[in-house]
Structure formats: C-alpha cells, structure tokens
Amino acid sequence: MKKVTAMLFSMAVGLNAVSMAAKAKASEEQETDVLLIGGGIMSATLGTYLRELEPEWSMTMVERLEGVAQESSNGWNNAGTGHSALMELNYTPQNADGSISIEKAVAINEAFQISRQFWAHQVERGVLRTPRSFINTVPHMSFVWGEDNVNFLRARYAALQQSSLFRGMRYSEDHAQIKEWAPLVMEGRDPQQKVAATRTEIGTDVNYGEITRQLIASLQKKSNFSLQLSSEVRALKRNDDNTWTVTVADLKNGTAQNIRAKFVFIGAGGAALKLLQESGIPEAKDYAGFPVGGQFLVSENPDVVNHHLAKVYGKASVGAPPMSVPHIDTRVLDGKRVVLFGPFATFSTKFLKNGSLWDLMSSTTTSNVMPMMHVGLDNFDLVKYLVSQVMLSEEDRFEALKEYYPQAKKEDWRLWQAGQRVQIIKRDAEKGGVLRLGTEVVSDQQGTIAALLGASPGASTAAPIMLDLLEKVFGDRVSSPQWQATLKAIVPSYGRKLNGDVAATERELQYTSEVLGLKYDKPQAADSTPKPQLKPQPVQKEVADIAL
C-alpha cells in the first residue's frame, strides 16, 4: 500500500512539474479575440457563426490531437443520428395517467430544424460542400413488441400528431407493412408476435466529423484564423482587464506559448469539465462529471447492408437509462453504407477516447465529491445497468442483436469501441447532487469564458446550442440590428417556433431539403389510427439522457 501511495504521489508531482515547466517556457505571447479550445463540431460551429457576425475578429483554435474531429465528432465515435425525436422514445415519456408528454420531443425537433437551416445556409455560402458527404436521407423508425409497448407506441403516435413537426409520420401494427419498411428486422420473426412501428421518411444520417472538417477548412481560408494541432491547454488565468492568458503546450516539441484572448470557449468534449475547473471561475464548482463509453456491432457485409435502409430505435427496459435504447442503423461512413447495432455501455475513467485514466480522479474536488456520491446513491438503476453492461459476453451482445435482426450471423459482425460521453452532475440545494439532462452552457458573469458540458443530443443540436451561447455571452450584440439581421439570414426561423405553424414548418423543411439534397414530400393528412385505452402508469423518476 505504501508503494502504491508513493507511486501516486510521485506521478502527481511529476505531472505538476511538467505543467510548471510548460508555464515557465511560455515566453512568447500571441493575442487573439476568440480562443476556441477543441477541434470538434461545437468549436467549429461557434467559429462559423462568429466569422459571419464579426468577420474582423481574430480567432485561434487549439486541438490536442493531430487532426480535428477525431474525438466525439468523428463519425465512428457516435451514432450519427440527426436527433429530431422522430423515433427516440425517451423523448416522449409516459405520464402517471398514461398520457404521453411530447414537450421534449417538440423541443428536440425544433432544435434540429435550426441545425438543418444552419447547414443549408453554409452550403449556399460554399462553406459546406457536397451535402451527400455529410448528410443523407435515412428513414427514422420506432419498433416495439409486446402489448404494453405497442399501446405506448400507438399513444405516442397519436400524441405527436398534435404537432406540425411530426406530420408525415406513419404507424403500423401489420407484419407485412413493417417488413416492407425494415425487412431485416422482420424476417425470421414469430408471425404471432405483437409488434408495432412508426416510420418517418425525412429522417437523416449525419457525419458530424465531415461537417466539422469542412467548417474548419473554410475558417482556415481567412488570415485572421489560426489552427494549432497537437496543442494542449495546460493553464488558464484571468487577467486584471478580464482577458485570459492561456498556456498551450506543443506536444511534439515540448515548447509552450501563452495566448491572450478576450473570449475563451471550451468546446473540448469530455475534457471541458477539467478545463473549466482550471479556469477558477466560481461557476465551475457546481459541476462534476461521470464518464460512460459505448460499443457498437458493425456489419459491412453487402448482404446485410443492402437489406436495410433505416434507423430503427427500440424501447429501453424499465429503469434503464436512455443510452440503453437499442437501435440498428444504416450509416454512411467514409463514403460507404454500413449497419451498426448498439450501443453497449462500457466504463472507463477516461473523459475522452484518447484521454487519461486519471481524468475522473483529477476532476474530483472537495466541491463536487459529495454531489457525485448523492447521485450514485439516488441512481442505483443506472449503476446496476452499467455493471450489467460491463459484464456482457460476446454471446450476450449477439443475442441482443437477434432481438432486432432475428437472422443475424455472427461472422457478419465485429465489435467497435465508440467515443466517451461525460454526464453532467450538478450540485443541488435539496438533493445534494443531480444528474443534468442534455447539455449545458456554463459561463462566468462577465461573459469572457464559456464551456459546453454534457453529451446528449449533442452534435445534432450544435447550431442551436451555440445560438444559446451567443445569447448568453454576447447578449448586447445579439440584440443589435446588425447581429439580428445576420442571425436571421443564417437561421430563417430564428426567434420563432415552427411548432403549430404548418405553413412555416413545410416551408423550412422544403428549403433545407432542396439545399441539402434530402427527401421531402409534403405530408398528407394523418391517418385515423385509433387511440389506445391508456392505463395509469407508476410515476417514474427522470433518468439520465446519455444516448450516444
């Protein structure tokens, strides 16, 4: 035990010495208006907004890896779903009286419409090129079995017809119809099994890594933008004039430099929490993080791939977190179609796929250790789920696949380790600590530094999330006529809700579909699927939304 303690102490001292050495060597200082930490889709999106809003502002982006979009934004490290709640059942929880709540589904869909408009605008500007390289039409389906689940899906479908955003969704309990929609899912299935499915033709598969690379490539064309790769942030210090001095180490030659920035955005994915803590702002003390990874089964066999064109999402088991929702998806990656099934949760103390095993420990402080303990005690179902996932065997994963693909063959599939997600834990006056759903922008009172924490729905809502950040940090500028006009040019529906306005919804979907090369047929009137007799349900507490 003494040897272990001594080893840990020496490692801590060594890491601190490296950090101090980097600070000492950082003699030259670079000045920039905006410093973007992290080369993922969030930094790329914010940089693209600011390039249009304030083209004269200088920007510097630093990324610790040798290329951009290599962590969570990488197409192989996420599910590639254009999350719009067309099929994700966790966005429509069932209330105690049996009714279906659609508020979150509407909000998620509204957010994705902003992303579609943002991307379409960038295509028109020539910033994004060849839309098929990053977004493709892939129908979105929900699929369930068993009487209770069928009743739930029928009720969900009926509830969503209240929203203009979900017009065009179809519902069926007919085996033949569902087989036509998703043959791979139905072939070999018990013909007596009670099943149901919904299908929306305008679903999408998105390669967020490709979007990120193209956005950053466009930013690099301007002389007042600098991209520094293999560059790791080692220290952040607020100056007396409310600017920030950020020490950045070059991981290739061991040198370091100071970057003086008027505004700092920490868009470093799983590393954002530690950097936010390093900044020393009081707001950082309220947060902790818990990492969860994911694995997928992948098939590139043409016999499988050519037999499936849909993203098919199931229903999580009672008490399990939404990230446990199984889905079998058509993906377009590296220019070719593949099929993925999962996710299967994994556990590592790393906050990034290319992170350190010390990430969890080094982010635990006297301020956030108690909230973390409270969350662990209050979310035993989540803990139990993670333990069960870690214990899964190869056979267990294959049996899970066969529930969605009855005729699956082991030799057609391989296991792939996707990215890490860090779930937000926030201090709470009543409960001590709570799991926060979705993502959260954390900034200082002066609006000089901001970080994005959280994971889901993540990249698919990068455009609206960065809009929220602009409003939070640059509120005075956002309200100016100049910024208002520019933002409405980028996002035509900015400041308005599409939900409830059929004409506006159809207009924006038609516009973005034409520009992005996506399928869109004006939806017909909703069918007359009968509403089910709703059964009262036990009240279920909200669980962590950490879907991949």
UniProtKB/Swiss-Prot annotation:
SUPFAM superfamilies on file: FAD/NAD(P)-binding domain
Class of the enzyme per the UniProt entry, highest EC level: oxidoreductase
Reactions the enzyme catalyzes: (S)-malate + a quinone = a quinol + oxaloacetate
EC numbers on record: 1.1.5.4
Domain of life: Bacteria
Cofactors named for this entry: FAD
Pathway(s): Carbohydrate metabolism; tricarboxylic acid cycle; oxaloacetate from (S)-malate (quinone route): step 1/1
Keyword Flavoprotein listed: yes
One BP annotation, GO: tricarboxylic acid cycle
Record keyword GTP-binding present: no
InterPro entries recorded: FAD/NAD-bd_sf, MQO
Keywords: FAD, Flavoprotein, Oxidoreductase, Tricarboxylic acid cycle
Stored Gene3D superfamilies: D-Amino Acid Oxidase, subunit A, domain 2, FAD/NAD(P)-binding domain
Composition skew (Low complexity), residue ranges: 530-541
Region span, Disordered: 521-548
GO terms of molecular function: 2-hydroxyglutarate dehydrogenase activity; L-malate dehydrogenase (quinone) activity
Pfam families xref list: Mqo (PF06039)
Matches recorded under PANTHER family: L-2-HYDROXYGLUTARATE DEHYDROGENASE, MITOCHONDRIAL
Similarity remark: Belongs to the MQO family.
Protein name per UniProt: Probable malate:quinone oxidoreductase
Gene name tied to this protein: mqo
